[in-house]
């Protein structure tokens, strides 16, 4: 049986963690980005399909390439973040299933149903984005996930000619807590959950 993590870890991962819009000028190393992936890759996905593909943008040139895709409300926070991750999904993720899920012919589940393949890729890459956020928090980083961007522009600018399609953006760095908004409420258990 697993042991519960400490109250401090729960605070870091959930109750005290915030979505950041402002950033300190502390850089995030490439080694730290590798550590993030080394943690997040272990999160579960359907049939271990692991459809997420991530581009970590950490240069001024990369940010300028991304700039035209950003909504006005997400522009400044993204340009000043040390790293912006494009979380994409591979529309042909199933080509890796013989390696990732060698328990029967899982590849055929998706090659025979393009709709199932797309739904699976999008849903599971979204879950993997959440794992990325938790991995960042576990390593002492802050994040700012965003869906306010022109996905078609990002796909054309970063993934043209490939099987990748963008899902969401996540700013990564060390947040400036002085720029946080007041914490917003969440739904109660009674409002969000049911017991049968």
From Swiss-Prot:
Classification via InterPro entries: Nitroreductase, Nitroreductase-like, Nitroreductase_HadB/RutE, RutE-like
Lipid biosynthesis: present as a keyword of the record?
A: no
GO molecular function terms noted in the UniProt entry:
3-hydroxypropionate dehydrogenase (NADP+) activity
Q: Which GO terms describe its biological process?
A: nitrogen utilization; uracil catabolic process
Q: What broad class of enzyme is this?
A: oxidoreductase
**Named cofactor requirement(s):** FMN
Q: Name one Pfam family in it.
A: Nitroreductase
Q: What does this protein do?
A: May reduce toxic product malonic semialdehyde to 3-hydroxypropionic acid, which is excreted.
- PANTHER family in alphabetical order: MALONIC SEMIALDEHYDE REDUCTASE RUTE-RELATED
Q: What is this protein called?
A: Probable malonic semialdehyde reductase RutE
Organism this protein belongs to: Escherichia coli O127:H6 (strain E2348/69 / EPEC)
What gene, per UniProt, encodes this protein?
rutE
